[in-house]
């Protein structure tokens, strides 16, 4: 059996697959191959689309599994680390779940007087 680790960062998604018995990494991949885009719509703001993260996770997992020569049923557990201070709000439907809006990433620098600009739905 194998363990899969996924690091969801603001520049890329990194995925590693480890053989449970030996502790050795048997496959790894990352995506996108160039730094993920970050939109700065105004000074001090930085946004990414959570839908892009999900696409990158799927691509990275497929790449790592291909390199490790394993199938989904060979994965015993998945561990996920995520960029700090992140919250992605989704709807309640598990089939069509999608993020409500682009996500401010950790490198947003909001002065307390600017916090009123954030709308909580």
Could you tell me what each predicted segment is?
Residues 1-99, 111:
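N-terminal glycine/serine-rich phosphate-binding loop of ATP-dependent small-molecule kinases
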Residues 105-121:
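Glycine-rich phosphate-binding loop plus the immediately following alpha-helix
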Residues 101-103:
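Adenosine ribonucleotide-centric catalytic and binding domains
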């Amino acid at each position: 059996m194998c363990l899969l680790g996924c690091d969801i960062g603001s520049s890329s998604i990194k995925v590693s697959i480890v053989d449970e018995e030996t502790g050795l990494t048997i496959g790894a991949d990352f995506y996108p191959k160039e730094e993920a885009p970050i939109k700065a719509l105004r000074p001090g703001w930085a946004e990414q689309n959570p839908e892009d993260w999900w696409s990158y996770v799927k691509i990275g997992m497929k790449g790592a599994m291909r390199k490790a020569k394993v199938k989904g049923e060979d994965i015993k557990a998945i561990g996920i680390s995520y960029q700090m201070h992140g919250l992605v709000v989704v709807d309640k439907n598990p089939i069509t779940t999608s993020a409500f809006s682009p996500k401010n990433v950790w490198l947003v620098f909001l002065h307390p007087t600017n916090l009123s600009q954030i709308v909580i739905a």
